[in-house]
């Protein structure tokens, strides 16, 4: 789908921009390609730059207040200064290499409820900046991520919601200032001890850190509390491992009152950091997505983990550069929901 918008900041007769994605479906770590088509207005114009940005919605806590904001988490300048003649037509090709930690937005060919992501086009002319062009992007799971999601479904877990939290997970190497949480309701065989499970993938070219947070039920004389698990899984093991058994082991480890070693129930080596190993593309890298097939603490943006605030690296106050809230968030939300302009 293409979104067109006259550069309103420049008035009637200004240049127009049309960003076209070759394929809006992609994977973490995979390329997203397309072209930016620019048409000059009724007068010559001096273009300062044309920049593309990956944007998504995230939840933020600042000063005890929770709110949604827009994260512009990857930027690519496709054109520097140039003279755009009246009526001139330009087509500028681009390639965005999706960050490995890019959140998943599409599972089993369906949009993941709560997730919003797109490419926003920014054009600066004569010190006026327009950010009106926006295209949705559909990020599918990598094979290893899909296998783990399949395992949760096979065990009877029901999807609840997904969101993106601003902050860092203690002890996990992150390159982005946020992480995704995919929440599940437990099936009957686990419901006696767990209210819900939050799943986070922190992906690198070598492996995936799987971070689990279990909201455990309280007993007659005990209060409920959270239990955490962190496991390192290899892209190479996507098709050679019984992931249903592995995930069941992770869940039962959380239910076990005894302290267990990291990686319990997983193949040998899981639970150990994999960073620094030689890089390689994951299985399926470069293929087109097919619809319809198949010891940590969090630096949360929400306040229900206050007891761990000293260990976490969260929001110290306000948002980092590149994040905007309020009207800008509303405009981007409207663009996703409203279709072509």
Each language-model region and where it sits:
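C-terminal beta-sandwich interaction modules and adjacent acidic
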Residues: 1-291, 310-324
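Short, low-complexity, glycine-enriched hydrophobic/amphipathic alpha-helices that associate
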Residues: 293-341
């Amino acid at each position: 789908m293409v979104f067109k918008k006259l550069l309103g900041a420049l008035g009637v007769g200004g240049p127009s921009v049309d960003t076209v994605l070759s394929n809006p479906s992609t994977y973490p770590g995979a390329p997203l390609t397309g072209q930016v088509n620019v048409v000059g207005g009724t007068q010559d114009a001096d273009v300062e730059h044309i920049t593309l940005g990956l944007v998504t919605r995230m939840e933020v806590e600042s000063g005890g207040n929770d709110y949604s904001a827009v994260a512009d988490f990857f930027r690519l300048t496709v054109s520097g200064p140039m003279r755009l003649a009246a009526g001139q037509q330009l087509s500028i090709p681009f390639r965005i290499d999706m960050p490995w930690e890019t959140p998943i937005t599409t599972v089993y060919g369906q949009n993941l409820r709560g997730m919003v992501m797109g490419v926003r086009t920014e054009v600066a002319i004569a010190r006026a900046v327009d950010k009106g062009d926006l295209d949705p992007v559909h990020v599918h799971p990598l094979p290893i991520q899909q296998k783990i999601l399949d395992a949760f479904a096979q065990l009877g877990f029901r999807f609840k919601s997904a969101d993106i939290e601003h902050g860092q997970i203690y002890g996990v190497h992150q390159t982005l200032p946020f992480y995704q949480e995919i929440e599940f309701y437990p099936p009957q065989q686990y419901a006696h001890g767990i209210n819900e499970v939050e799943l986070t993938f922190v992906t690198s070219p070598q492996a995936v850190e799987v971070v689990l947070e279990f909201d455990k039920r309280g007993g007659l004389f005990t209060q409920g509390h959270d239990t955490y698990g962190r496991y390192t899984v290899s892209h190479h093991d996507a098709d050679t491992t019984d992931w249903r058994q592995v995930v069941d082991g992770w869940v039962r480890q959380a239910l076990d009152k005894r302290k267990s070693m990291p990686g319990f129930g997983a193949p040998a080596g899981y639970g150990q950091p994999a960073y620094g190993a030689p890089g390689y593309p994951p299985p399926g890298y470069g293929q087109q997505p097919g619809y319809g097939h198949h010891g940590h603490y969090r630096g949360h943006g929400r306040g229900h983990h206050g007891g761990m605030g000293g260990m976490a690296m969260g929001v110290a106050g306000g948002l980092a550069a590149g994040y905007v809230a309020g009207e800008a968030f509303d405009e981007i939300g409207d663009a996703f929901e409203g279709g072509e302009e």
